[in-house]
């Protein structure tokens, strides 16, 4: 502050003290900051001083309001005997803008005690101030006290109630209104959409169409489009689209984006693309929304193609675009494309470690590249909870439980608070490693140490851990003490453990619970049939398969795929359609001879008992993951690591066979089934035969 301004401030300070305005003293410092004394308002202090000397406090207050010095302005209001209406208007306006409820109440109280009779403008400003500050009780008191109300008064109250979700109060006032404009309707329709009542919003919008002189504006139809999208009602969406065209609002590109989103959410992807193509000035939000619609509809190729168009346009992808594309790569396990996106982000100057780390970690872990996932987290200055959690889960699924627990420890040391998903992954790591006592310790720490509540997922993980370890009595005790009803996932875990240990009685109990929850899920029937077969109970096994046939349940075929030179090759069990099928089967037969020489014994116990032993062995050759592994070996150079993905859990025979294949071919073979990654190398699997 220069010498001239300091002198002016000193003069003003002295004047205030003489006038016994000592409450100003604590606020004087604010007059000297850059908000008040700046090149455009360097004489502000002099103006306030001069006006106060002349007892023109109302005008001084106006100056302070102009400088947004609300507290000082309200303090000075006590010196003003009869400030003009404009002064009250200015004060209330600043209170509204800054959400200053306490100052607003002081201004309102001054109006009451000063004898000033407010007009409709000031009443409405008081209403709006209380509503914007979220004090609807005070707003309603003002509304009820008003001698007269205009349309604005009603609109402010209706909108205020709707904004905070008090829809019953809002609708009651709305229905009492003798006159409504587009603002009234929009406030009510918006309130219903925000409160997740899109059906009510659409009913009200339809009613609006039938009311004379109630023409919807661009905001009304935007909200109506969002409501149609929320209920996925394409008929209503198309009706609103027609209204937009008839009302001449179809030149607004924001509306086009809303329509595109509506068509996409209703599953009309081609219509959404037509709208997208009509948008002249496409922003990154439009691009990202359309790309996301393709991915959510499993139209992957078109989604990636549109992303390529975006990259070639003058518009630049943002963090949401990259996250969506990386998530698609994760879902499809297309690591090569994911790496390209990662590289592109870096080349164009985005910092992938700052905003897309969780998507990158998820992509790399789902593709089985756990080292790259670790590199992403290790490179983050401050990884977020999602990144930590994804990596912990990835380590668990990739057969690195010790690494999973190490990163959980690092998460805690970083000051990040774990959530219930984090503990699901931590418990999963213990499950995959058979760390029962450690898992129990983590389970009880959720409530005792971290002050979180146990969820159904936590109990499912604990039961899975106990089931895989054969601790069935302890498992029963946990289930009986659960505060919630056991889920289908929990009973499936019980059934899986019973399958491993041949616990038929408990398996039948779990199966009965699953039949109640999901009577058409083939996995339960197949698992029970296999349990009976393994125990030599062929009559029960036959009854189970007959039951499947009677109710029309069919086993989902196993399918496996591998990517060679950016082309995906999919194999289904016993499918002969692949052009290299004969070569693949012959190669597997040769491998089987070598495997037997090294001690391989085919696991034929689960194959139908009325088939000859030789045919049982032959049937095992045609399992989808064996076909995919053999093809990948034949299609790559010697020593190349290969990856295969499967939609179901690996069977015992395939798991054992691939261990032998990895040793014979000297290959690192990674297989991701429905539960985890299996990394086979030198005749061993990362799961330790515990899956």
Curated annotation (Swiss-Prot):
GO terms for molecular function: RNA binding; zinc ion binding. Residues 597-691 are annotated as: Type DYW motif. InterPro entries: DYW_dom, E_motif, Pentatricopeptide_rpt, PPR_At4g14850-like_plant, TPR-like_helical_dom_sf. Keywords: Repeat. SUPFAM superfamilies: TPR-like. It comes from the Eukaryota. PPR repeats lie at residues 84-118, 119-149, 150-184, 185-211, 217-251, 252-286, 287-317, 318-352, 353-383, 384-418, 419-449, 455-485. The keyword Amino-acid biosynthesis does not apply. Residues 490-565 are annotated as: Type E motif. One of its GO terms (biological process) is RNA modification. It holds the Pfam family PPR. Residues 566-596 are annotated as: Type E(+) motif. Belongs to the PPR family. PCMP-H subfamily. NCBIfam families: PPR. This is Pentatricopeptide repeat-containing protein At4g37170. It comes from Arabidopsis thaliana. The gene is PCMP-H5.
């Amino acid at each position: 502050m220069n010498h001239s301004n300091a002198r002016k401030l000193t003069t003003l300070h002295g004047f205030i003290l003489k006038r016994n305005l000592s409450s100003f003293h604590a606020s004087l410092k604010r007059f000297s900051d850059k908000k008040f004394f700046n090149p455009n308002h360097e004489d502000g202090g002099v103006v306030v001083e001069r006006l106060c000397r002349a007892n023109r406090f109302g005008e001084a207050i106006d100056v302070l309001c102009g400088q947004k010095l609300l507290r000082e302005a309200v303090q000075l209001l006590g010196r003003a005997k009869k400030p003009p209406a404009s002064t009250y208007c200015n004060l209330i306006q600043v209170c509204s803008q800054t959400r200053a409820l306490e100052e607003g109440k002081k201004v309102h109280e001054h109006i009451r005690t000063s004898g000033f009779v407010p007009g409709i403008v000031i009443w409405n400003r008081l209403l709006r101030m209380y509503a914007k500050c979220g004090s609807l009780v005070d707003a309603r008191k003002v509304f009820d006290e008003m001698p007269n109300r205009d349309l604005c008064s009603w609109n402010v109250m209706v909108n205020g109630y709707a904004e905070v979700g008090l829809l019953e109060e809002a609708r009651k006032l709305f229905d009492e209104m003798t006159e409504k404009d587009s603002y009234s309707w929009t406030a009510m329709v918006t309130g219903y959409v925000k409160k997740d009542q899109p059906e009510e919003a659409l009913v009200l919008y339809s009613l609006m169409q039938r009311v004379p002189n109630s023409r919807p504006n661009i905001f009304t139809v935007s909200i109506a489009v969002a409501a149609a999208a929320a209920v996925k009602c394409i008929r209503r969406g198309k009706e609103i689209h027609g209204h937009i065209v008839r009302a001449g609002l179809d030149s607004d590109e924001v509306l086009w984006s809303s329509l595109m989103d509506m068509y996409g959410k209703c599953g009309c992807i081609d219509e959404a693309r037509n709208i997208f193509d009509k948008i002249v000035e496409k922003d990154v939000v439009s691009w990202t929304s359309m790309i996301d619609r393709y991915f959510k509809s499993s139209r992957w190729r078109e989604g990636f193609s549109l992303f390529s168009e975006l990259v070639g346009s003058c518009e630049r992808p943002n963090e949401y675009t990259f996250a969506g594309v990386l998530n698609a790569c994760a879902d499809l396990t297309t690591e090569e494309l994911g790496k390209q996106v990662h590289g592109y982000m870096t080349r164009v100057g985005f910092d992938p470690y700052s905003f897309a780390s969780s998507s990158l970690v998820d992509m790399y872990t789902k593709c089985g590249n756990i080292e790259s996932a670790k590199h992403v987290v290790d490179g983050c200055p401050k990884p977020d909870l999602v990144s930590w959690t994804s990596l912990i889960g990835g380590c668990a699924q990739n057969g690195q439980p010790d690494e999973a627990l190490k990163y959980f420890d690092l998460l805690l040391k970083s000051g990040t608070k774990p959530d219930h998903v984090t503990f699901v992954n931590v418990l999963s790591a213990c499950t995959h490693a058979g760390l029962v006592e450690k898992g129990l310790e983590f389970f009880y720490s959720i409530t005792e140490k971290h002050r979180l509540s146990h969820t159904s997922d936590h109990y499912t993980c604990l039961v899975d851990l106990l089931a895989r370890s054969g601790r069935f009595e302890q498992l029963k005790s946990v289930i009986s003490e659960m505060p919630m009803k056991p889920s289908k996932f929990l009973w499936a875990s019980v059934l899986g453990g019973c399958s491993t240990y041949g616990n038929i009685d408990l398996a039948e109990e779990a199966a009965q619970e699953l039949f109640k929850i999901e009577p058409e899920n083939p996995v339960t029937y197949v698992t029970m049939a296999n349990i009976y077969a393994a125990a030599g109970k062929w009559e029960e096994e036959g009854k189970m398969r007959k039951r499947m046939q009677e109710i029309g349940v069919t086993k989902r075929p196993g399918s496996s795929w591998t990517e060679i030179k950016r082309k995906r090759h999919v194999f289904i069990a016993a499918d002969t359609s692949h052009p290299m099928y004969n070569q693949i089967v012959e190669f597997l037969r040769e491998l089987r001879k070598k495997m037997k020489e090294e001690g391989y014994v085919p696991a034929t116990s689960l194959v139908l008992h009325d088939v000859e032993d030789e045919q049982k062995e032959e049937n095992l050759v045609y399992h989808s993951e064996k076909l995919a592994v053999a093809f990948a070996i034949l299609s790559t150079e010697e020593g190349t690591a290969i990856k295969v993905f499967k939609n179901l859990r690996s069977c015992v025979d395939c798991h054992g066979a691939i261990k032998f294949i990895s040793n014979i071919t000297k290959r690192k073979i990674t297989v991701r089934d429905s539960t985890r990654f299996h990394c086979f190398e030198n005749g061993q699997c990362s799961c330790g035969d515990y899956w």
